[in-house]
From Swiss-Prot:
CDD domains: STKc_TEY_MAPK (cd07858). The modification Phosphotyrosine is found at residue 311. It catalyses: L-seryl-[protein] + ATP = O-phospho-L-seryl-[protein] + ADP + H(+); L-threonyl-[protein] + ATP = O-phospho-L-threonyl-[protein] + ADP + H(+). SMART domains: S_TKc (SM00220). Residues 149-439 form the Protein kinase domain. One of its GO terms (biological process) is asexual reproduction. Residues 8-20 have a biased composition (Polar residues). Signal peptide: none annotated. The keyword ATP-binding applies. A motif (TXY) lies at residues 309-311. This is Extracellular signal-regulated kinase 1. Dually phosphorylated on Thr-309 and Tyr-311, which activates the enzyme. ATP binds at residues 155-163, 178. The lineage of its organism: Eukaryota, Amoebozoa, Evosea, Eumycetozoa, Dictyostelia.
Length: 529
């Protein structure tokens, strides 16, 4: 019976297990059903969440749009402010410009009114008041001229003085008037003034500036400022070279030809200019060229000491023999200067822009090549000779490559002007006869000076009073109506022998003797009449 019991019990246990399993399944189903209920509820929640997200996104987008609108409004306001500021600035600038224009117009009107008040137009027939003086103030300096001249404007000022353009009411010509203030305070400058006046008064040439008048002071005692009246030119060669104005080969040819034509007249009088440079070559709008500023000029055969050592020529246009202190230099120094100016016309910049003496001679040798040993031996300074030897053998630069657009004849002429050895350079007559000037050269229209100059006073230690006397003497030549005009003595007259003069006092006495003799001759002639 036991087994059965056991079997039954086993069956019971099995049933119980099955029942227990059934209960477990039911529990799981209940859990599952509970989870399903949760799952069935999530779409509503998700929909609500989605709506919330959409609302949040819409709000964020709206806020972003509003922020962008605010930024756009701010940017527009800033732009408007900038435009307003620009308009205000433009208006302010316009107002400032208008004020400046008004001030300039007022200034011009005031100047014109002052000129009209100071100098009314002179009558066309009555010139009785032409000798009455009238004063202007130009750059702080009193500018006193006769009413014969109507001042137009200031055209230059510097250490040398003031230059004004003016109209000569007697002739109708336009002139330039240069005032040399305190002309007798510096003896070196006074001597330069005397030299230039004396030379220009005698030179009469189309390509040399001419002195038309030296204004007469009220008295010799009041003679402190020198006023020189000359031709009025439009510009100078330096201004033309540095301008954008195109320069053709015809321009270069005509300018250099006129330089040489004027220089021929100077050299024929045995005078060296010694300071040729573009700013000393005056030009008119019709391309007429005139050489000016002979203040550094010298007579070639001068025997006085110091002739070779005195400062001469602007460095860029200075010949090698001047820089290196050769024992003697000649008219060839002016040909060198013309060559430098010619190259500047071709290249529109200076050929040798040396910063000092050493740099200048270095540039020259690097361009035209090393000099020969014979040329080096002509240099007086041993250190200069050694410096050039230490440079070694420098080859010559090809000017045709330097100036590729230049006329071949122009290149040939330039090379012949810029030899290191002055004796190998062309003379002014040879340069004028060069093929480059074939269409211009006419020996019959290239006049020379008919008499030689001999400026013996260069050797004397002239004092202030004697220099003043000599310049006053030169002034009298322009005023034959002056009672003292008969006392005028031409220092270059062969009859006025200066060779025996040894001192300034002897010269002064000789001048007085000459004047007394002239005065006696005038009186005798008056008695006969």
């Amino acid at each position: 019976m036991e087994p059965e019991f056991d079997h039954f019990q086993s069956q019971m246990d099995s049933d119980n297990t099955h029942q227990s399993t059934m209960f477990n399944v039911q529990d799981n189903n209940a859990i599952l059903m509970s989870g399903m209920e949760n799952v069935l509820q999530s779409p509503r929640q998700l929909q609500a969440a989605a709506q919330a997200q959409q609302q949040a996104a819409a709000q964020a987008q709206q806020q972003q749009v509003q922020a962008q609108q605010v930024q756009a409004q701010q940017a527009q306001q800033q732009q408007q402010q900038q435009q307003n500021q620009q308009q205000q600035q433009q208006q302010q600038n316009q107002q400032n410009q208008q004020q400046q224009q008004n001030q300039q117009q007022q200034s011009q009107q005031m100047t014109q009114q002052q000129l009209q008040q100071l100098m009314p137009p002179p009558p066309t027939s009555d010139t009785s008041n032409f000798n009455d003086n009238i004063s202007y103030f130009v750059y702080g300096s009193q500018f006193t001229v006769p009413r014969r001249y109507s001042i137009v404007k200031c055209i230059g000022h510097g250490a040398y003085g003031v230059v004004c353009s003016a109209k000569d009411n007697l002739t109708g010509e336009k002139v330039a008037i240069k005032k040399i203030s305190k002309a007798f305070d510096n003896l070196k400058d006074t001597k330069r003034t005397l030299r230039e006046i004396h030379l220009l008064r005698h030179f009469k040439h189309e390509n040399l500036i001419s002195i038309k008048d030296i204004l007469k002071p009220n008295s010799k005692e009041q003679f402190e400022d020198v006023y020189i009246v000359s031709e009025l030119m439009d510009t100078d060669l330096h201004q033309i070279i540095t301008s954008p104005q195109p320069l053709s080969d015809d321009h270069c040819q005509y300018f250099v030809y006129q330089m040489l034509r004027g220089l021929k007249h100077i050299h024929s009088a045995n005078v060296l200019h010694r300071d040729l440079k573009p700013s000393n070559l005056l030009i008119n709008e019709d391309c007429l060229l005139k050489i000016c500023d002979l203040g550094l000029a010298r007579v070639e055969d001068a025997t006085h000491q110091g002739f070779m050592t005195e400062y001469v020529a602007t460095r860029w246009y200075r010949a090698p023999e001047v820089i290196l202190s050769w024992n003697k230099y000649t008219k060839a120094i002016d040909i060198w200067s013309v060559g430098c100016i010619f190259a500047e016309l071709l290249g529109r910049k200076p050929l040798f822009q040396g910063k000092d003496y050493i740099h200048q001679i270095t540039l020259i040798i690097e361009t035209i090549g090393s000099p020969s040993e014979e040329d080096i031996c002509n240099i007086a300074n041993e250190q200069a000779r050694q410096f050039i030897r230490n440079m070694g053998n420098q080859p010559k630069v090809n000017f045709a490559n330097m100036f590729p657009k230049a006329n071949p004849d122009a290149i040939d002429l330039l090379e012949r002007m810029l030899y290191f050895d002055p004796s190998k350079r062309l003379t002014v007559e040879e340069a004028l006869a060069h093929p480059y000037f074939q269409s211009l050269h006419d020996p019959s229209d290239e006049p020379i000076c008919l008499h030689k100059f001999s400026l013996n006073f260069e050797a004397w230690d002239l004092n202030r009073d004697l220099l003043k006397e000599l310049i006053y003497n030169e002034m009298l030549a322009y005023h034959p109506e002056d009672p003292q005009a008969p006392y005028y003595t031409d220092l270059n007259n062969p009859n006025f022998n200066l060779s025996r003069i040894q001192s300034s006092s002897e010269l002064f006495n000789l001048l007085q003797q000459q004047k007394q003799q002239i005065h006696q001759q005038v009186n005798q002639q008056s008695i006969k009449n």
